[in-house]
Amino acid sequence: MNLDLTPLAWRLAGTPLAAWANDVQQQLDAKLAIGHGDLPRWRRAVDALPTLMPTQIELRECFRLAAPCDEATRQATREALMGLSPWRKGPFEVFGVHVDTEWRSDWKWARVAPHLDLAGKRILDVGCGNGYYMWRMLGAGADSVVGVDPNWLFFCQFHAMKRYLPELPAWHLPFALEELPPKLEGFETVFSMGVLYHRRSPVDHLLDLKDCLVRGGELVLETLVVEGDENTALVPEDRYAQMRNVWFLPSVPALERWLRRAGFVDVRCVDVSVTSVEEQRSTYWMRYQSLPDFLDPQDHGRTVEGLPAPMRAVLLARKP
């Protein structure tokens, strides 16, 4: 795994992010020194991937890497990638190996991407997971993408793909949003997808996202919502769809109000979709329980706790 962030500093030179980018290597090295118990095993899995040069790279319509290779090489690729399971976001097609992830993240991207112009943009993806969407952002023409997510497995899954795309301007940092400097004000587009409902203080999260944006920059916010008016927000008594760390599920009108209160303008909802058991499910690459296990077996409109089943909205907003 190549963890040299010098290319990131070069890429962001001359931007409002230059000073931060020059210091971020030190921050990464400090986190790596603390590490994680499984990190050596996951790094070995990445290093076990065959040395191949992609002859075809597709990021716009899907994530696909292709190159001539024999069955033994394909099997080695499969085994190395399986060493990084569970795979949650994807799918990835890597030299003929189909990584069928828990989420059909390509479906979400198909709902989000038509509403965005990412050409030439400096992007921050907060809670980026394994970086699937980061690659798709590059496919949509982004200038550079920085993703932050403190999960070390996701970090290694990203580097499994980065191994074959070393020159592309995407960087995954194993940080929480709170570990970035305050008032960065240097990204032209900031994504927060699947994060807000995990935050105990959702409006503070919106303010933190705004602080990462340049003036005129765009926020892309995707989160769980419920039906209701501008005063509606569901706070689960305990779990929601078996997740413990779910705090606020607002209605779309309430979320629009939160965004305006946080100082955003041009707030609009561009998509609302009920999550189906075809979009999120267990697979060979993610063998734990998934959405079908979290819904009422008699009524897929309800969770096992009797709450409204997952429904997700995508909202866009601009920093004035």
From Swiss-Prot:
Binding site for carboxy-S-adenosyl-L-methionine: K89, W103, K108, G127, L177, E178, M193, Y197, R312
Superkingdom of this protein's organism: Bacteria
Enzyme class of the recorded protein, top EC level: transferase
MF (Gene Ontology): methyltransferase activity; transferase activity, transferring alkyl or aryl (other than methyl) groups
Function: Catalyzes carboxymethyl transfer from carboxy-S-adenosyl-L-methionine (Cx-SAM) to 5-hydroxyuridine (ho5U) to form 5-carboxymethoxyuridine (cmo5U) at position 34 in tRNAs.
One example of a Gene Ontology biological process annotation: tRNA wobble uridine modification
Family stated for the protein in its record: Belongs to the class I-like SAM-binding methyltransferase superfamily. CmoB family.
Reactions mediated catalytically: carboxy-S-adenosyl-L-methionine + 5-hydroxyuridine(34) in tRNA = 5-carboxymethoxyuridine(34) in tRNA + S-adenosyl-L-homocysteine + H(+)
One family name in Pfam for this protein: Methyltransf_9
E.C. designation(s): 2.5.1.-
Entries under InterPro entries matching the protein: CmoB, Mo5U34_MeTrfas-like, SAM-dependent_MTases_sf
Keyword Protein transport: no
Swiss-Prot/TrEMBL keywords: Transferase, tRNA processing
Protein name: tRNA U34 carboxymethyltransferase
Subunit and interaction comment: Homotetramer.
Recorded name of the encoding gene: cmoB
Lineage of producing organism: Bacteria, Pseudomonadati, Pseudomonadota, Gammaproteobacteria, Pseudomonadales
